[in-house]
Amino acid sequence: MTQKLTITRPDDWHLHLRDGAALAAVLPDTARQFGRAIIMPNLKPPVTTVEQAQAYRARILAALPAGMSFEPLMTLYLTDNTPAEEIVAAKASGFVHGVKLYPAGATTNSDAGVTDIRRCAGALEAMQRVGLPLLVHGEVTDGDIDIFDREAVFIDRVMTPLRRDFPELKVVFEHITTRDAAQYVRDASGPVGATITAHHLLYNRNAIFTGGIRPHYYCLPVLKRETHREALVAAATSGSDRFFLGTDSAPHARGLKEHACGCAGCYTALHAMELYAEAFDAAGALDKLEAFASFNGPAFYGLPRNTGTLTLEREDWQLPAELPYGDATLVPLRAGETLRWKAR
C-alpha cells in the first residue's frame, strides 16, 4: 500500500476565488497546493473585458500572502454581445487563457450569460482563429428539462452543433457529471477536454439527502446517480489526456448555504488534493493521479508543467468544522470529518 506520493505541483483548471475579503480568505488555500488556476469570471459585475480581467488579476496578486507563489490564469465571461475584437485582445494580453460560456441562469451569477449560442458566432469564430479556449458550463436551463438531465440534453442541443460549426475551437467541457459527458469527451474529434471535480468523483446524489438535507453537498451541476460517478472515476483514471483536474471550489458564507434558498457550490480548495488522492486511491489508480492533476491541463492549454512538487502522505487528520470568511464563516466539504491523506 502506497504511504507517500510525490507529484509535480498540480494546477486547478476551474476555480472560484470571489473578490474582496472573500478572496483574501480563500486564496491561500489554493496557493498552498496549486501552482496555477483558471479563475472563473462570474463576479458581480462579471469580468467581460480584458481591462476588467487585468484589474481582477491585480487584486488576486495583491491578496497573495508574502512568500507564496501562485499564477492566476484569467478568463472572460462570454455574453451575447462579446465582440470579436475583445477576443483578439484577450489572446494578445498573455494573461487571459479562456472564455467562459454560462448559459443564462445556469448557476451562481450567470444572469448575464448567453441566451442563444448563435448570437456568439463572431466571438466563437475569433476564438477558433486565435486559439483561445471556450470553457463551457454544459447545462441547458429550460424549465421543462429535469435538473438531472440538463447535461445530457446540452450535449445534443448545444455541444454537438457547436463542435460541428467550429471544429477547430478548443473546448473544455467543465465539471462534467455524467457518463454521457465522459463518453462524449472521450470519443469527440478535435480539441476537446474536460475538468472533473473531487466531489463528483467521491459522491453521488444520495450525499445531498442522507439523514436530511445536506446543503454543503449541493452544487451545480448537481451530483448524479452512482452509475455516473463510476463513469467519471473511470474517465479520470483512464490515462486519457482529455481529462484533468478542476475543483470548481466555490465558497459561500455559511448563512447563504444553510438557508431556505441556499447557494450552490462546494468548498474544497483547502483539502482538494487530499480528496483527489482519496478518489484515486479507492480506484487503485494512484499512479494515474499525477497526469490528471499536473500534466493533462498544461498540455491542453499549451503551457509548461510546473517545476515544483507536492507530496501526499497517508495520514489521518481532522478537517476544521468551519473557516474564516471575511465577516462570516465558510464550511468546507466534509467539515469536521477525518481525511486519510495529507498534502505537504
UniProtKB/Swiss-Prot annotation:
Binds 2 Zn(2+) ions per subunit. Its EC number is 3.5.2.3. Substrate binds at residues 16-18, 42, 137, 220, 252, 264. Pfam families: Amidohydro_1 (PF01979). CDD domains: DHOase (cd01294). Keywords: Hydrolase, Metal-binding, Pyrimidine biosynthesis, Zinc. The keyword Kinase does not apply. The modification N6-carboxylysine is found at residue 100. It catalyses: (S)-dihydroorotate + H2O = N-carbamoyl-L-aspartate + H(+). Its cofactor is Zn(2+). InterPro entries: Amidohydro-rel, DHOdimr, Dihydroorotase_CS, Metal_Hydrolase. One of its GO terms (molecular function) is dihydroorotase activity. The keyword Cytoplasm does not apply. GO terms for cellular component: cytosol. Zn(2+) 1 binds at residues 14, 16, 100, 248. Belongs to the metallo-dependent hydrolases superfamily. DHOase family. Class II DHOase subfamily. Catalyzes the reversible cyclization of carbamoyl aspartate to dihydroorotate. Homodimer. This is Dihydroorotase. It comes from Cupriavidus pinatubonensis (strain JMP 134 / LMG 1197).
